[in-house]
């Protein structure tokens, strides 16, 4: 049962967008922004993901969650991050990625609840050509997942190495 819920609720929307436009280092100008997605968070997904990966009562037990400081079920942070990746994969363009370098920050600002509809906004925070590998650039993006009310539920800075069109 867990496998079915996780695959249906996370796996299906996690497919890559059809024929995404490749983004090279030069495409990541300071004003680059993109947004998209509509991910519907279900109670079944929160419960099953919580039971499998983060078995806290406010993720796994509606009665206990109602009595918690959250006043109801909330999604595990690792589920919110996974949904962010599913939304990212659905964007109509994708970096020509050499490697991910990591996250500089990750904040979970507002709890995600069953019934929420999440969307993603991505903008360039910084980009510079690599000194050691001038055929690539280092791009830092600010990513923000919002609920249907426009409230941030996850914000992060992600750094990656992206292929350049030319050698500099």
Tell where the protein language model's regions lie, with residue ranges.
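Hot-dog-fold acyl-thioester-processing enzymes
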Residues: 2-102, 165-168
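HotDog/MaoC-like acyl-thioester-processing domains
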Residues: 1-29, 108, 112-117, 121-168
